[in-house]
């Protein structure tokens, strides 16, 4: 019997082919991350503002025109331009001469350190008025103490009045003591007057005896 050769397997992807297929995806992702590095929005804004010769500063509309002339897509990156302006003003690289926020006019700050120095000074001046406000309640607290001292003084004045009333209360007692001996002196006199009255019944007895004698004589 003749041996038959095994049929060839259908086209199966080799393992190396799968790895090769995955690599292009990673390369595509790397291409997205590796965009051509150009100047940032803040750098473009600073260049455009420094190039302007206007004394009052470069307006937002003029800034957009300058960026568009340099090949920057202003319509798509409108929000980035506004954020870049705000960050540059907060850092002190740009000074806003007109308007508020991202709208208005901007110019380069010749002394960028001045903005950072002025901010802490304002905080220090705002903190100074708090010290006198703290002293006022202390002064107000001292005033009631003086009022309490004034209230204490009438108590001292009341003490002599109380002493005078005590002396006045004691004086009637002395007067009562002085009046008592007189009553005691009068009482013996009354006792003496009563004693002779007790002696009178004794004098009546002889009269009764005399009456008996006269009756005996008549008999």
Curated annotation (Swiss-Prot):
GO molecular-function terms, A-Z: double-stranded DNA binding; nucleosomal DNA binding; structural constituent of chromatin
Region ranges (Disordered): 1-40, 94-219
GO (cellular component) term, any one: nucleosome
Pfam family, one: Linker_histone
Compartment(s) of residence: Nucleus; Chromosome
Example GO BP: chromosome condensation
Disulphide bond pairs: none
Residue positions where N-acetylserine is found in the record: 2
Record-annotated H15 domain positions: 37-110
Chain intervals with Low complexity compositional bias: 1-19, 27-39
Keywords, comma-separated and alphabetical: Acetylation, Chromosome, DNA-binding, Nucleus
SUPFAM superfamilies in UniProt: Winged helix' DNA-binding domain (SSF46785)
InterPro entries named in the record: H1/H5 (IPR005819), Histone_H1/H5_H15 (IPR005818), WH-like_DNA-bd_sf (IPR036388), WH_DNA-bd_sf (IPR036390)
UniProt biased composition (Basic residues): 119-134, 142-159, 167-185, 192-219
Job description of the protein: Histones H1 are necessary for the condensation of nucleosome chains into higher-order structures.
Entry similarity comment: Belongs to the histone H1/H5 family.
Name under which the protein is recorded: Histone H1.01
Source organism (scientific name): Gallus gallus (Chicken)
């Amino acid at each position: 019997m003749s041996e038959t050769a095994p049929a060839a397997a259908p086209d199966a992807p080799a393992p190396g082919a799968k790895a090769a297929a995955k690599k292009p995806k990673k390369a595509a992702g790397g291409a997205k991350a590796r965009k051509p590095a150009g100047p940032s929005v803040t750098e473009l804004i600073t260049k455009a503002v420094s190039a302007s010769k206007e004394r009052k500063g470069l307006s937002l509309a003029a800034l957009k025109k300058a960026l568009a002339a340099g090949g920057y897509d202003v319509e798509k990156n409108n929000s980035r331009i506004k954020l870049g302006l705000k960050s540059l003003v907060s850092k002190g690289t740009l000074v806003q001469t007109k308007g508020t926020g991202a709208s208005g006019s901007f110019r380069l700050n010749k002394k960028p350190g001045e903005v950072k120095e002025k901010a802490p000074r304002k905080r220090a001046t705002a903190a100074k008025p708090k010290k006198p406000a703290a002293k006022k309640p202390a002064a107000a607290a001292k005033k009631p103490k003086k009022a309490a001292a004034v209230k204490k003084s009438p108590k001292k004045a009341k003490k002599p009045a109380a002493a005078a009333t005590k002396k006045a209360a004691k004086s009637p007692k002395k007067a009562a003591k002085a009046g008592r001996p007189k009553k005691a002196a009068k009482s013996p006199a009354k006792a003496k007057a009563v004693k002779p009255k007790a002696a009178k019944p004794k004098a009546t007895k002889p009269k009764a005896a005399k009456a008996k004698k006269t009756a005996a004589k008549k008999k």
